[in-house]
């Protein structure tokens, strides 16, 4: 039989007691409560010191959210182009078909493009962080600059330079806006 110690029932600062049936008013002995951590657990202490996602998590996050945002925006734009393509005498079924085809085509196209931009950005940002061992505004600006340049490189040097400048400015504005939002909006 297990010995009940008072320290087993006390919650330290890194754990909290979890009662799986607390909403059902089921009496349960405190020795059967679970101790859950209040912060993420890491296998290596070096991982816990870094306050950022890993390169794989960044790759998945930026690519996935980029694809989702691009698909939604493209589908929204496709709805309007589908409505514009209506002709006199179209039945309701044909109108719905035009809207669905147009929004699906635009959603796929925009989703793929923005997803690729997220993929390139995540790769460059993770590479810059690995080389410089810093994660600041300039890291995002360099990643945005590189993303724009790589994304438009096939269209020529001038197009790549313009897209790189736009990407760097956009990434810097987003990061600066995020810091301003964190400072003034207490959420």
Swiss-Prot record:
Signal peptide coordinates: none
Pfam families listed in its UniProt record: Tim17
Main subcellular localisation: mitochondrion
Membrane topology: Multi-pass membrane protein
Membrane-crossing segments per the record: 63-83, 111-130, 137-153, 160-177
Keyword field contains Kinase: no
Family listed: Belongs to the Tim17/Tim22/Tim23 family.
UniProt subunit comment: Component of the TIM17:23 complex at least composed of TIM23, TIM17 and TIM50. The complex interacts with the TIM44 component of the PAM complex.
Keywords (A to Z) from UniProt: Membrane, Mitochondrion, Mitochondrion inner membrane, Transmembrane, Transmembrane helix
Function: Essential component of the TIM17:23 complex, a complex that mediates the translocation of transit peptide-containing proteins across the mitochondrial inner membrane. Links the inner and outer membranes.
Keyword Metal-binding carried by entry: no
Domain of life: Eukaryota
MF term (GO), any: protein-transporting ATPase activity
CC per GO annotation: mitochondrial inner membrane; TIM23 mitochondrial import inner membrane translocase complex
Localization per Swiss-Prot or TrEMBL: Mitochondrion inner membrane
Tissue spec: Expressed in roots, flowers, cotyledons and leaves.
Organism encoding this protein: Arabidopsis thaliana (Mouse-ear cress)
Protein name as annotated: Mitochondrial import inner membrane translocase subunit TIM23-1
GO biological process: protein targeting to mitochondrion
